[in-house]
């Protein structure tokens, strides 16, 4: 049995990264001349991917794009599109790249800045009159730059339940509900990853261009760059050309157990139409290599024309908020940055004394990474169709070292060690969770006291009802919970310990939750929610729900 952490790990592990912006207070080494040929670098990268695939034999597919000096030196697929099928992945296979889409959204705004239609530091209200947030001051002052920099003051993943898992809410409804999502921290004080503000950025693109986000991406990015295989929305991705999602769905918890295919198409588990600007794109190694070349060339296209200006390119990699800081690498953390920051749609940091910029991406059944090293005019991407975050760590770190010609860490051994430690910790937690339920106190009230409609200001309604299912010995009666805007989040609500209950969603791709009811009078009046698993994906932001009986 094994565990692979959620996309939290893909986005927030000690990432190697890239940027042409200076990092404040950090002296960076001069890049040493690299006399290796493109073929030598490509061969080393190819061999490394094959080693990693051998070390993680359950991984179905990996896709690699490697670019140097504006030229694709390697675009290749490894493995199969779906587990157990003779359907090879190649450089044209589509993968969901999730949050790697964010730097495309930033580039869309860069184009509008160049055209004089948008300013980076202009308040959102200039473009979206009436826009507001739960903190009126933040709603008044927040700018385009803020929406792209994870510094608005929201908690990690705040508001993601508006569109994750697949929701029935429209883009306009998500934008309207953003006004009620709680803001926990100071404005522009701390970094907290926030998909919701990229939805706002996407709305600015739509309002100021007159095009939908997806049409703008298609006509102003994909068509200009020559990315003919890419699609801006997962529902447009042909399943026959896609790497299908895989993951571990237990038992005992999500991200544990055996590897399995979890969907027959990407859109089945990743329909982010309402939040596409935060992570909607599906692309191939063949196409994304072209995008990497544009970013490394500061917006210049292969024909010499510009997609966006050099000034805009510099602005997009200018650090806006500190993610973390440290004393640098150690034997235990060999790739730890001295300073890690977030710019606009890209994370910017140091690595091995050089300036770097990166982003991760994670969707159900797939994680990915893009790494740019502009001082060397080299960059790469790694796409996968499973949630093996330690595999991605080994791939990303090892390929970065190959690109920088400094191979001195065994990233497979390092990642395997961390994987084993994480597995042991998570399985222990799962045993403790089940043991506590077995020994838990009974609820203080009969089950019908908890029945009703429970409302959160930003999510909406959660309905609890009594339900009977099956016949004879298979007959089951109990509480059934239903998130009204999220079809997959419905299932049995079982007593756990006292006034705390836990869900048992039949769809094992989803994360279960604890609900604790607060007894005010004769019936529960309010309730709070949190995830069951210690490895829960941050986008299940149950903890932000504040339920009141309607």
Task: Describe the residue ranges of each PLM region.
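N-terminal secretory signal peptides and thylakoid transit peptides that target proteins
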Residues: 1-17
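Boundary at the C-terminal end of the N-terminal hydrophobic targeting segment
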Residues: 27-29, 33
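Peripheral terminal and inter-domain segments
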Residues: 33, 323-324, 332, 397-550
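Short, conserved catalytic-motif segment at the N-terminal edge
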Residues: 36-97, 117-119, 127, 133-134, ...
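Active-site SXXK
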Residues: 46-49, 64, 70, 95-124, ...
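Short, surface-exposed loop or secondary-structure junction motifs
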Residues: 82, 136-364, 369
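Short, well-ordered beta-strand elements
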Residues: 358-359, 369-372, 376-385, 527-529
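Contiguous hydrophobic, core-forming segments of folded domains
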Residues: 374-404, 408
């Amino acid at each position: 049995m094994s565990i692979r952490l959620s996309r939290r790990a893909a986005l927030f592990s000690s990432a190697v990264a890239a940027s042409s912006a200076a990092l404040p207070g950090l002296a960076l080494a001069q890049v040493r001349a690299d006399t290796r040929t493109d073929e030598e670098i490509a061969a080393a990268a190819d061999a490394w991917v094959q080693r990693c695939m051998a070390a993680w034999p359950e991984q179905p597919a990996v896709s690699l794009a490697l670019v140097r000096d504006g030229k694709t030196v390697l675009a290749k697929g490894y493995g199969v599109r779906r587990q157990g099928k003779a359907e090879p992945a190649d450089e044209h296979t589509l993968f969901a790249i999730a949050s790697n889409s964010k730097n495309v959204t930033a580039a869309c705004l860069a184009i509008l800045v160049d055209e004089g239609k948008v300013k980076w530091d202009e308040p959102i209200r200039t473009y979206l009159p009436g826009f507001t947030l739960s903190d009126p001051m933040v709603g008044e002052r927040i700018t385009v730059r803020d929406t792209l920099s994870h510094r608005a003051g929201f908690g990690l993943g705040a508001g993601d339940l508006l569109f994750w898992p697949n929701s029935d809410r429209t883009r306009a409804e998500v934008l309207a509900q953003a006004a009620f999502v709680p803001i926990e921290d100071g404005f522009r004080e701390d970094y907290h990853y926030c998909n919701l503000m990229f939805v706002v950025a996407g709305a600015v693109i739509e309002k100021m261009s007159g095009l939908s986000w997806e049409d703008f991406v298609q006509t102003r990015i994909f068509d200009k760059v020559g990315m003919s295989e890419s699609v801006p929305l997962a529902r447009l991705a042909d399943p026959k050309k896609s790497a299908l999602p895989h993951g571990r769905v237990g038992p005992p918890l999500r991200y544990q157990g055996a590897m399995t295919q979890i969907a027959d198409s990407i859109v089945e588990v990743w329909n982010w139409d309402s939040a596409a600007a935060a992570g909607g794109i599906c692309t191939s190694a063949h196409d994304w290599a072209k995008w990497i070349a544009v970013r490394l060339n500061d917006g210049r296209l292969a024909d010499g024309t510009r997609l966006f200006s050099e000034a805009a390119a510099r602005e997009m990699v200018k650090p806006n908020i500190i993610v973390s800081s440290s004393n640098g690498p150690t034997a235990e953390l060999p790739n730890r940055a001295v300073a890690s920051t977030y710019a606009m749609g890209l994370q910017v940091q140091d690595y091995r004394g050089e300036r770097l910029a990166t982003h991760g991406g994670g969707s159900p059944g797939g994680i990915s990474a893009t790494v740019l090293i502009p001082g060397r005019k080299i960059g790469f991407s790694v796409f996968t169709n499973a949630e093996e975050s330690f595999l991605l760590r080994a791939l990303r770190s090892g390929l970065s070292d190959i690109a920088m010609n400094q191979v001195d860490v065994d990233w497979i051994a390092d990642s395997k060690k961390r994987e084993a430690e994480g597995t042991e910790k998570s399985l222990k937690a799962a045993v403790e969770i089940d043991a506590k339920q077995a020994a838990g106190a009974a609820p203080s009230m009969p089950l019908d006291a908890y029945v009703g409609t429970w409302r959160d200001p930003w999510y909406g309604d959660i309905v609890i009802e009594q339900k009977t299912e099956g016949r004879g010995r298979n007959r089951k009666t109990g509480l059934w919970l239903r998130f009204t805007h999220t079809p997959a989040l419905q299932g049995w609500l079982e007593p756990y310990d006292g006034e705390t209950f836990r869900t048992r969603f039949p769809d094992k791709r989803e994360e279960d939750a604890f609900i604790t009811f607060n007894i005010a009078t004769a019936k529960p009046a309010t309730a709070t929610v949190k995830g069951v698993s210690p490895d829960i994906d941050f986008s299940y932001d149950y903890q932000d729900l504040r339920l009141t009986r309607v």
